[in-house]
C-alpha cells in the first residue's frame, strides 16, 4: 500500500511542491535500519536469543548480531562480546514494516504524541526509538521475559530535512510540531 501510495500520489505532489524538473530528483525511502541493544548478552550468551527471534519476527528478515568494538569495564563489556542485533530493510519489506509501524505499533505505544522535527539529522534521515517492542502484533506478550526498546533509522534520498519531512508527512508519519 505504501509503495503504491508513493508511486501514485507522493511523487507527483513532491515534484510540484519543490519544482523538480525530473522525477528522479524526488526524495524516496532508501532503507530502514532497526537496532535492538541487549546489554544482558555481555554476561549471558543465551540472553540474545529471545531479542534475536523477536526482531526476526518484527522485521520479517533475519537480523545480524552486533559486537562490542572495545572493552568498557564500567558496563562489564569485553571487546567482541555480543551487545545486540540489527536488521536493514529495503524495498517491499521496508514498506511493509513502515505500514505496520505507523498504523499498528505507534498507536499502541504508551504516551505517544508524535515525532519531533528535531529528530532529523540535517541530511534528510530520521531516527527515533521505541520503548517497548511489544507494540508490534508479532510479539506474543506471554512468551517474552523482558520488554526491550528499539532504535529505528529511516534513510531517505532527500537532500534536506524539509524535503524528508514532507516525504514522511505524505506517508502519514505523525509529527506533533508541524
Curated annotation (Swiss-Prot):
MF annotations from Gene Ontology: rRNA binding; structural constituent of ribosome; tRNA binding
Record has tRNA-binding as a keyword: yes
Source domain of life: Bacteria
Cited PROSITE patterns: RIBOSOMAL_L5
A GO biological process held by the record: translation
Gene3D superfamilies with a match to the protein in the record: 3.30.1440.10
Alphabetical keyword list: Ribonucleoprotein, Ribosomal protein, RNA-binding, rRNA-binding, tRNA-binding
Keyword RNA-binding: yes
Gene Ontology terms: cellular component: ribonucleoprotein complex; ribosome
Entry function: This is one of the proteins that bind and probably mediate the attachment of the 5S RNA into the large ribosomal subunit, where it forms part of the central protuberance. In the 70S ribosome it contacts protein S13 of the 30S subunit (bridge B1b), connecting the 2 subunits; this bridge is implicated in subunit movement. Contacts the P site tRNA; the 5S rRNA and some of its associated proteins might help stabilize positioning of ribosome-bound tRNAs.
Assembly, per entry: Part of the 50S ribosomal subunit; part of the 5S rRNA/L5/L18/L25 subcomplex. Contacts the 5S rRNA and the P site tRNA. Forms a bridge to the 30S subunit in the 70S ribosome.
Family note: Belongs to the universal ribosomal protein uL5 family.
Protein name per the record: Large ribosomal subunit protein uL5
Organism: Wolbachia pipientis subsp. Culex pipiens (strain wPip)
Taxonomic path: Bacteria, Pseudomonadati, Pseudomonadota, Alphaproteobacteria, Rickettsiales
Encoding gene (name): rplE
Amino acid at each position: 500500500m505504501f509503495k503504491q501510495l508513493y508511486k501514485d500520489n507522493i511523487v507527483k505532489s513532491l515534484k510540484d511542491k519543490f519544482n523538480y524538473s525530473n522525477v528522479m530528483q524526488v526524495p524516496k525511502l532508501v532503507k530502514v535500519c532497526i537496532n535492538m541493544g541487549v546489554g544482558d548478552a555481555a554476561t549471558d550468551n543465551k540472553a540474545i536469543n529471545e531479542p534475536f527471534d523477536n526482531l526476526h519476527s518484527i522485521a520479517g528478515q533475519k537480523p545480524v548480531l552486533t559486537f562490542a568494538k572495545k572493552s568498557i569495564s564500567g558496563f562489564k563489556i569485553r571487546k567482541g562480546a555480543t551487545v545486540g542485533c540489527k536488521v536493514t530493510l529495503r524495498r517491499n519489506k521496508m514498506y511493509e514494516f513502515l505500514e505496520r509501524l505507523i498504523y499498528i505499533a505507534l498507536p499502541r505505544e504508551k504516551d505517544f504524541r508524535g515525532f519531533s522535527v528535531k529528530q532529523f539529522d540535517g541530511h534528510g534521515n530520521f531516527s527515533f526509538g521505541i520503548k517497548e517492542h511489544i507494540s508490534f502484533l508479532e510479539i506474543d506478550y506471554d512468551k517474552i521475559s523482558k520488554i526491550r526498546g528499539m532504535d529505528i533509522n529511516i534513510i531517505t534520498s532527500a537532500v534536506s530535512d524539509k524535503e524528508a519531512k514532507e516525504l514522511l508527512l505524505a506517508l502519514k508519519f505523525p509529527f506533533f510540531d508541524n
